[in-house]
Amino acid sequence: MRSVPGRVEFIALLAMLFATIAFSIDAMLPALPEIGADLTPDAINRAQLVVTSFVFGMGIGTFFTGPLSDVFGRKPVLLGGAALYITASIFAAYAETLELLLAARLLQGLGAAGPRVVALAIVRDLHSGREMARIMSFVMMVFTLFPALAPSIGAVIIDVTGWRGIFWAFVLFSSIASIWLMVRLSETHPRENRRPFRLKTFRAALAELFGQRVVVISIGVQALIFAMLFSMISTVQQIYDISFGRAESFPLWFGGVAIFAASGSVLNAALVMRLGMRFLITAMLSVQVVMAGVTLALFAFGLSGTPAFALFLVWQLSVFFQMGLTVGNINAIAMEPVGHIAGLAASVIGATATVAGVLIAVPNGLMFDGTPVPLAAGIFIEAILALLLIRWLVRAEAAEAA
């Protein structure tokens, strides 16, 4: 018989699993200056790779965790990922070179891919329809608060223990979540429902997936949207510190922006049925082209002081806010023609877009020169390309329907 905790405990457990990702990214941001000074003092921009290497590993892991959980069950994959995450965190705590730290962070990301995919599958195993949507809305409500808190938590830990202490916090966090999962939740995907992995079927599904123009274009749009986010996240701490001299208050500003940005998902839920997914994506990307273009122009012409910081703050909010009105919608568009292979499609689409987004974001972040200009230029270009792609998709769909 399945053992399922009560609703409040179930939601809290899932939220903690999801929060592993936000904690692993956002709590690291205050540590980047110390990591740069300790491990790469001659090229401090390379400390950004501590963020993007984790996301890259998570993207790769997303390819495998969904299918593996269908074959072996949800709990073994989640707990195996947690074991990898904890082991990698310990290695990271003892890393003496940036290269070893980046390798450990990549392995951390691989382990963290489990909560990203498998926790959602657990909800789907136990609930469906409106009840599933209700459970996930509560989970995401809790989850969206974590990016607001994580930098402050990270800053406190780093002040007390130094940057290596943050990895021991990751070990503790994941250990608590894993023990909670083991003790309180039974396997939700019983053996009789599992499917053996067949390479031939997998290849055929991939060929079908990437043979759909709407899927390929949607992945391109999503990758560029992710690139904007990853570029901002990997560079934002340096901009607060070096460009504006606000390193100490960074966690508070970042938390405030994250709280306001979370309302993007709420607004999307209210508007998407009336205005449509394609319109909202096009509108938000158009706004981002204008915002990034104005930011680029004003910083290039030497805007400084409080007005410059206020402009950056508004622009940062726009980059985070647009995620709530674009990513879910572009995912839904990509999934429209491949509902019969939804599980595989979700994993492959998410993984491909994440990995591509990281590969685009890394050079953008490494160009940081002490000002927001390189970041604004990169996001301006990414927004234009994403806007062109979604417009191409809309026109192609209109032509096919005619």
Predicted regions and their residues:
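Conserved MFS/SLC helix-loop-helix module at the cytosolic interface between two early adjacent transmembrane helices
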Residues: 59-99
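Helix-breaking motifs and short loop linkers at transmembrane-helix boundaries and internal kinks
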Residues: 73, 94-100, 111, 128, ...
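Extracellular/periplasmic helix-loop-helix junction of adjacent transmembrane segments
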Residues: 32-59
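Helix-loop-helix hairpin linking two adjacent transmembrane segments in secondary transporters
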Residues: 100, 134-183
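Cytoplasmic helix-loop-helix junction between adjacent transmembrane helices
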Residues: 104-144
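Juxtamembrane intracellular "pre-TM" segments in multi-pass secondary transporters
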Residues: 1-3, 188-218
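Paired small-residue
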Residues: 84-91, 99-107, 310-315
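Extracytoplasmic
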Residues: 9-41, 232-237
